[in-house]
Amino acid sequence: MEFSQFKVNALMEITARPDLVFVRGQGSWLEDHAGKRYLDFVQGWAVNTLGHCAPEMKRALAEQADKLMNPSPAFYNLPSIELAQRLTSASCFDRVFFANSGAEANEGAIKLARKWGRVNRNGAYKIITMNHGFHGRTLATMSASGKPGWDTMFAPQVEGFPKAEINDLDSVRALIDAQTVAVMLEPVQGEAGVIPATREFMQGLRKLADEHGILFIVDEVQTGMGRTGSLFAYQQFDVIPDIMTLAKGIGGGIPLAALLAREEVCVFAHGDQGGTYNGNPLCAAVGVAVFDTITAPGFMEAAQARTRQLSEGLLALSAKRGLRGERGMGLLRALVLDRDDAPAIVEAARMLAPEGLLLNAPRGNLLRFMPALNVTEADMARMLEQLDGVIAAVRK
């Protein structure tokens, strides 16, 4: 079937898409309508923790679909209880609210912090966030984000999100006032170019929050569920946040997100928060399968080995091609180029024949890598070899 035969104009235009339609995937590979295969190092923007069509997920979906799909969030269901127990047992948090997307989880975190401020801080409502941060595409989460141009895109913004600079504690301190209720950040700023927070900054934020009696919120939508080398990124900084959000990797490809909080922060009253599909057993059962897979003995050790392979490979490529190095945490990494040709490299990689390569360029001079956590050593080596060839070809 030719691409022109697909009625793509029935879809609303929200982004520039190439002229291909993906029809199947397995592991680290996708196949389009013409039968061409692509090595996928985007994985739905760090969503597909176990790659495409993971057998553990397919099994969980089939088994749960045969039992119960959605009885309504007004009732308990077993998979949501099991997943909540797993998440709280593996973290510093006490309670979980399930949602469908990272934006929804972050919106919930904002609402919870503001409710806590009303109860405990005389109505304090401001949440300090970071320039260049990304928290979602609802009006409130866009306002909380620090992406250039977003302050006017759907103006007026939701008020109450002063912006500090990541890894600059003084910039945060200068913004704290009587109306401040929390500080919120990504442990690694993904859209900004894979910029990790430093240990000193994260610990400084915890100390500042304690000194001023405000909340410390970590947005782990992209960094959570093993992506950065530990189950949750905050665990590598030796800090205890008050609130954490998860999405992307927790569902491994299905719509699932979570808002986690410590007991003393859980101030929602009945009716304050909810959602038609939230915590439905079908998605929660997949979440349990993903959690059990990545916490099984040996899984994270294998992912850490692939992290070393990717980091060392990117460093070698950087030295060979005169680039500016690599950075990141775990299997969320970036190759920093010496010029703004990242979009051209992404395009050329996708056009490779007979098999393409899918990459992401959040900045003109930067490539981002978000493979499945169970990517094989052979596929990692293949990607590095393909990337070297593409860079050479683009720069001839």
Swiss-Prot record:
N6-(pyridoxal phosphate)lysine modifications at: K248
Subunit description: Homodimer.
A single BP term in Gene Ontology: L-arginine biosynthetic process
Cell compartment(s), UniProt: Cytoplasm
Main location: cytoplasm
Keywords of the record: Amino-acid biosynthesis, Aminotransferase, Arginine biosynthesis, Cytoplasm, Pyridoxal phosphate, Transferase
Organism per entry: Bordetella bronchiseptica (strain ATCC BAA-588 / NCTC 13252 / RB50) (Alcaligenes bronchisepticus)
Family classification: Belongs to the class-III pyridoxal-phosphate-dependent aminotransferase family. ArgD subfamily.
Protein name: Acetylornithine aminotransferase 2
Gene: argD2
